[in-house]
């Protein structure tokens, strides 16, 4: 059943592939805008181990009933001995025109000056409007604090101390890249690689870039 839901959610979205020439155009467009953080998930390097998700849970004190991040194992092809998987990161897209911000009655859901969509815990009343409005289904209500939670690129736990998000540091395959969207590292990667962005109806442009990749894995290893 979980595979069916994921397949349906992915099927509803718009997938736009870009090449290096397109990324240079994006870079020129962004020069006049505010600084934005962005993340790259290189699916060709990701092995689906979910070490990033476990590190995120520990660092950000997520309960067992909720998660800021997960790597979905989506079967693409199947045979007797091996299955080809697409490892897809499920987390906040930090999208422009985020519906979670629009529906929040207290202003607890907001975007900071670096483009990170965040939750102000002291203002959240636990109404779950933002959770229902998120088309990606990547928010949850913490059963202990009764506050909405989601990926915020470790804004308080890591970024404020000068460290990248814990998922980036924990990934054993170096499948995650994080930084200012206009930084040389991010722009060089976008220039040199074919990538895509996944956007669902009702949400604005995401700030999560993805490089498509699939992996053949023996069934007993998954």
UniProtKB/Swiss-Prot annotation:
Keywords: 4Fe-4S, Iron, Iron-sulfur, Metal-binding, Repeat, Signal. Disulfide bonds: none annotated. [4Fe-4S] cluster 3 binds at residues 92, 95, 100, 134. [4Fe-4S] cluster 4 binds at residues 104, 124, 127, 130. [4Fe-4S] cluster 1 binds at residues 46, 49, 52, 171. CDD domains: PsrB. Predicted to be exported by the Tat system. The position of the signal peptide cleavage has not been experimentally proven. It holds the Pfam family Fer4_11. Residues 1-27 form the signal peptide. The keyword Acyltransferase does not apply. GO terms for molecular function: 4 iron, 4 sulfur cluster binding; metal ion binding. [4Fe-4S] cluster 2 binds at residues 56, 151, 154, 167. It comes from the Bacteria. InterPro entries: 4Fe4S_Fe-S-bd, 4Fe4S_Fe_S_CS, ET_IronSulfur_Cluster-Binding. PANTHER family: PROTEIN NRFC (PTHR43177), PROTEIN NRFC HOMOLOG (PTHR43177:SF3). This is Uncharacterized ferredoxin-like protein YdhX. The gene is ydhX.
């Amino acid at each position: 059943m979980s595979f069916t839901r994921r397949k349906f959610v992915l099927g509803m979205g718009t997938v736009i592939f870009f090449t290096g020439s397109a990324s240079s155009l994006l870079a020129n467009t962004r020069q006049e805008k505010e600084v934005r953080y962005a993340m790259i998930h290189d699916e060709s390097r990701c092995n689906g181990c979910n070490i990033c998700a476990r590190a995120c849970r520990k660092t950000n004190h997520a309960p067992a009933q909720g998660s800021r991040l997960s790597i979905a194992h989506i079967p693409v092809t199947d045979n007797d001995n091996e299955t080809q998987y697409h490892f897809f990161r499920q987390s906040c897209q930090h999208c422009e025109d985020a519906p979670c911000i629009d529906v929040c009655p207290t202003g607890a859901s907001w975007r900071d000056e670096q483009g990170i969509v965040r939750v102000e815990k002291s203002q959240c009343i636990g109404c779950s409007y933002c959770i229902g409005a998120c088309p990606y289904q990547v928010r949850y209500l913490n059963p202990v604090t009764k506050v909405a939670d989601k990926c915020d690129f470790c804004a308080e736990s890591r970024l404020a101390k000068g460290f990248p998000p814990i998922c980036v540091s924990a990934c054993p395959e170096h499948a995650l890249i994080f930084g200012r969207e206009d930084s040389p590292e991010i722009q060089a990667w976008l220039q040199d690689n074919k990538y895509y962005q996944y956007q669902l109806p009702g949400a604005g442009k995401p700030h999560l870039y993805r490089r498509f990749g699939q992996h053949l894995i023996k069934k007993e290893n998954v």
